Amino acid sequence: MSHQPILCLLLTAVTVLSSCLDEQDFHSPEQPETPSVPTVPEGNYFADSLEYTPEKQRQTLTDIQRGYFRFFYENCQADSKMALIGTERSINTVALAGSAYAATAIPVAVERGWITRKEGAQRFLDMCTFLNKAERYHGAWSHWMDGKTGTGLPFNQKQQSAGDLVETSFMMMGLFICSEYFNSEDATETEARAFVSKFHNEIDWNFYTNGEKTLYWAWDKDLGFAPLKITGPCEALPAYLLALSAPEEYAVTEDVYTNGWRGNKFFNAGRTTYGYTFELGGEEKGGPLFTTQHPFLWINPFLYQDNYADYWEFCTNHALINRHYSLNDAPKEYLYDEYNWGLSACYGPEPLGYKGRAPGESRDDGTICTTGAMGTIPVTPFYALQVIRSLYETPHLQGTYGIADAYNRSLAWADSRYLSISVMPVVSVI
């Protein structure tokens, strides 16, 4: 493979423009707060009416998309203009992956007329300016950072002050999207693009092999490499693609992709689950839905090919398997149905908490990630829209920025929080 820079494929920045180009702009300093969770009769958690005209459906998608963009644009960290981890979290801790998805959404907002091109370019530059001063670890940024100083913050016991290669790859993908979109000779756009080129030339992907034929997820300046190799299939595909296409000094060789991405349980020839071809990975029913959603914000699975997989089929069947399990195999007390499914990473009622949910007794506790099924709209649009319409009409899930993170029907629990890593990808996939 050549080490030429990858031209990222933005799937959806300009695909849904018909309904909102004449909408009134919002500007964060003046935008009034949307009322918080409304008061509704006890027990009225779920949608009663699902009658939708095409116009109402279009408006529903627009409202969801715009509300989630407002979460980033109005609720960013004040100094860095990067995305916060989420609501009810530190107002100074920024999330690298959340910021990557937010950067990807900026061109969408410009095309939809929610912000001007000038405002979008300025936010792009503000984020780049912060990233340029932020602490780096052989070119990679930290999973979480102090938005005031740029210092890397602890994420887990193995990542106290560490570069996170996967989330760095996400951030670069988002910046590449902005670079492709903000391509004029305007001074702001030119300066921002120069930062992105600089970052591209500084990330030492080869260092993160640790001398092996694989990539490692993270490296801590005091603790060394975290014991976590990046093997597919998972959300980390962009890390391998950018490592292959990096400048020669820092690029990895093709055998790192072949041996690292494939891993030991990558290909299972002939395997089917519920009648769907599902030959990739060690999980017969698939992991959390985000693992086949987030990387394909930037990589078109219909076009991307390697020697091992049909990634469009893989993404589509992952969604169909998740839905089939929920409707047919999950415990009946979880009350899943065609309007209530979508197992992915999300908050949960205490003591269940946040975790990556997926089909199977050990990974499913009845908690539905609202953006799980939403994120399947490119591959299973009819099934996704069934869920989206229901969520939109569920009062207890509505908050300042629209549909909140998660709910559990069997426990009559509905969350009121938002996570940047959950909501920001939806802006682009819609």
Task: Set out the residue ranges of the language-model regions.
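Bacterial Sec-dependent N-terminal signal peptides
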Residues: T15-L50
